[in-house]
């Protein structure tokens, strides 16, 4: 294994072999390149037009999908949302779904206009839902992972332990070492594989000139981008699957029932066992099978 102190000098794709092993993929890895479109950065997987678009959650980045994309084996586009990964930060700190959807729509229109499926987790799920309502031609089918418009309210009601890794977004921003950053991450998600979390921190952090480490994502200052999201649901006509983590507190049964009752395109809700909020991190292979089933129709 590569030592922690050597990570800062690595290419962002240097650990993909670990993701492939986790996904059970032994064949040659597909091509993957970083693409920049104005303020938005993304990962383009494969040489053909993307069949699946992936939007990550708050405090994450496009690499959160690496294992899932490798397991799925299809051309894909994974986008860094504004203020995350290698995408630009907003001066107002509003990273809500409304402005996010406006920012990623032209990127999807250019790079993945014919995608069959959009997959969004948490903040990415709300962004995808907003995109489906405002730019329906870009969202032929939707999978929302562990989120409904009530998720911001649920977030306010949770303890630090119930939030899991999401709690890190509200915590310290600078660390003396990569190891210190990894330690707080492991403490927030003790059920997760340490190597998987190590990759996650590698992709979600950067070393500063003074040798300390910090997160790649900006501080959330919210704005009004999370308001009125339930008002969009009656206009959600794209076929939609809701995936829930069985151990998550971000979506309760009442939220799921209300979403299914209100969204015209609602197809099914699937609960993933032994998973918290981040299904792609906790149970990536189970998510791969769900996405394959959705794509088959």
State where each predicted segment sits.
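Alpha/beta-hydrolase fold catalytic core
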Residues: 1-50, 73-74, 113-114, 295-297
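Conserved HGGG/HGGXW glycine-rich cap/lid loop of the alpha/beta-hydrolase fold
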Residues: 38-88
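Active-site loop/oxyanion-hole signature of alpha/beta-hydrolase fold enzymes
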Residues: 67, 77-119, 289
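Gly/Ala-rich beta-loop-alpha elbow adjacent to hydrolase catalytic centers
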Residues: 120, 124, 128
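Flexible "cap/lid" loop of the alpha/beta hydrolase fold
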Residues: 133, 140-174
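Conserved alpha/beta-hydrolase catalytic His-Asp/Glu region
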Residues: 173-227, 232
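Conserved serine/cysteine hydrolase catalytic core
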Residues: 207-262, 271
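Catalytic histidine-centered segment of alpha/beta-hydrolase-like enzymes
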Residues: 275-284
């Amino acid at each position: 294994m590569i030592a922690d102190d050597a990570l800062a000098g690595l290419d962002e794709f240097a650990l993909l072999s670990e993701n492939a092993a986790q996904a059970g993929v032994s064949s040659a890895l597909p091509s993957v390149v970083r693409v920049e479109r104005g303020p938005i950065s993304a990962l383009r997987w494969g040489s053909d037009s993307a069949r699946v678009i992936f939007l990550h959650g708050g405090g994450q980045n496009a690499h959160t999908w690496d294992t899932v994309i490798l397991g799925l084996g299809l051309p894909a586009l994974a986008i860094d949302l504004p203020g995350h990964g290698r995408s630009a930060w907003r001066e107002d700190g509003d990273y809500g779904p409304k402005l996010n959807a406006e920012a990623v729509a032209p990127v999807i229109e250019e790079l993945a206009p014919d995608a069959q499926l959009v997959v969004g987790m948490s903040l990415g799920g709300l962004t995808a839902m907003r995109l489906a309502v405002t730019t329906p031609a870009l969202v032929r089918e939707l999978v929302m992972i562990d989120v409904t418009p009530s998720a911001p309210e649920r977030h306010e009601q949770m303890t630090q332990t119930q939030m899991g890794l999401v709690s890190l977004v509200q915590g310290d921003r600078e660390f003396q070492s990569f190891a210190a950053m990894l330690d707080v991450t492991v403490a927030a998600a003790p059920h997760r594989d340490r190597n998987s979390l190590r990759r996650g921190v590698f992709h979600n952090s950067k070393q500063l000139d003074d040798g300390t480490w910090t997160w790649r994502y900006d501080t959330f200052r919210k704005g009004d981008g999370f308001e009125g999201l339930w008002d969009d649901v009656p206009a959600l006509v794209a076929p939609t699957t809701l995936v829930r983590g069985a151990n998550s507190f971000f979506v309760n049964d009442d939220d799921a029932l209300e979403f299914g009752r209100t969204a015209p395109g609602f197809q099914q809700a699937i609960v993933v066992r032994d998973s918290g909020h981040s299904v792609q991190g906790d149970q990536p292979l189970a998510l791969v099978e769900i996405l394959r089933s959705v794509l088959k129709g």
